[in-house]
């Protein structure tokens, strides 16, 4: 995924009302931009940090600029735009970056499935193999006090994420292939674990899903102001 023109940078003043953030340029100009992330954004929205934003050419948008990246005091870059996770996953699958997901003929997105009225992020199909259901999650929470490079998901209690695990478990039990794909959108994260200390129920459901045959994949993104792409697998640690 390339950014043309390249992302512009400014300093974060504050994030508020979930969808908005105020930024300041070197010349003192203050601007309100859109924040495409309704989550906790733990460690991703510290006032004073550098941020990068894109600009839409849609004249109807009230806030044409969208917050894309943050940079921490340690120099780590984080993609905070949650929409990018699915886009990067689709791009990586189509370019055969994710070796575990090669060999399928058809890729569909947002397909209805399951008993809890869900939509799967990505559905892969081929005539010679079971359907492959892929739920994509972005990982941006770095543990800055414990093991070096340890990332966690989720960063807050997620009943929606719990539902997705139940749906994936059902798919695996019914003979389909079921994948939980963590897209790691924080340059400082080198391994991922379930955040039992944040959402114990999610952690338990994930273990049950794995026992039922759900596969867990983690792929890390390379992040810059001109391009984002998934580049390599990293470990998931139970």
Curated annotation (Swiss-Prot):
TM segment ranges: none
Superkingdom of origin: Bacteria
One GO MF term attached to the UniProt entry: DNA binding
InterPro entries found in the cross-reference section: SfsA, SfsA_C, SfsA_N
PANTHER family per the UniProt record, alphabetical: SUGAR FERMENTATION STIMULATION PROTEIN A
Recorded family membership: Belongs to the SfsA family.
Protein name: Sugar fermentation stimulation protein homolog
UniProt lineage: Bacteria, Pseudomonadati, Pseudomonadota, Gammaproteobacteria, Vibrionales
Gene: sfsA
